Amino acid sequence: MKRFITYVVTSLFAFNFGVSASALWPWSSYSTEKPASLPAVPLIPATPALTESNITAPVPQIVFGGGRLKLVSEEAQLKSQSLQYDIKVRYPHIVGANEPHIQRLNRRIEELVSEQYYGIQHPLKEDLRYYRQRWPEALSELFIDYVVTLATDSILSIYFNAYSYGIGAGTSVQYGFTVNYDLVSGKELKLSDFFQHRANYLAFISRYCTDQLATHKSGEWLHRENLAPVISNFDSWNITRTGIRFNFDEGEVFGCSEGEQAVEIPFAELKSLLSARGLSILRNSSVVGL
């Protein structure tokens, strides 16, 4: 994750579900003072912001893993007036198998999501005292939803989109984080797993993303330093059916008003750089272009 935000709040969040869901979901009730025991898109063009009055249907279930596994949505709705926070998160949970690596993945997802709101639930005493004096009715807010970019027998790739706003801040903040998992080996994937050891793949990714984003209507103001060929600039990525998508948070490559951005590099463009292992993982997933 490119950034970790401790006190952030928003009154809106947006997401896009690959096949059908560009939606938020209805909230029925909140927990009160005591939080639940949870551990807890990128779009081209940028995601339009939605208000809670626009919230519609939940994300549909996804069946994968040869029909054996199912992704269902779990929700956490946490609110405390005394601690001045309002948290709404949704994340995927795998059902249909009890294998240790599936259970580890479920825990990993829950913990990753819960890490995002731990700081909001546990404000410093001096900060809370200040909030109560200056903004007694205000709430820190965090909204998180997810996009599944690929779910096959061998790969699960998930993008989490977060909108947050901190008490006293002038505007909300968008940021994203990802999980890319090899269901065959039972391990989380790193970007380097797909490329030849000596291949200068970061230089290629940097150049490709820079060229694509430079054609944007705000290309003149592209933050090129954030596209330099270093791994930290490309640590938010997902596998899709047709390529590897690189996600850039709001304000990372353009001004904040342009929203979050993403660039997908087709597998055909990457093929000469891919390692034997990378090719094997991708071909087992029946992706297009290899």
Regions found by a protein language model. Name each.
Residues G18-L290:
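Compositionally biased intrinsically disordered regions enriched in Thr/Gly
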Residues L12-F13, F17:
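Hydrophobic core
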Residues M1-F4:
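Positively charged n-region of N-terminal signal peptides that target proteins for export
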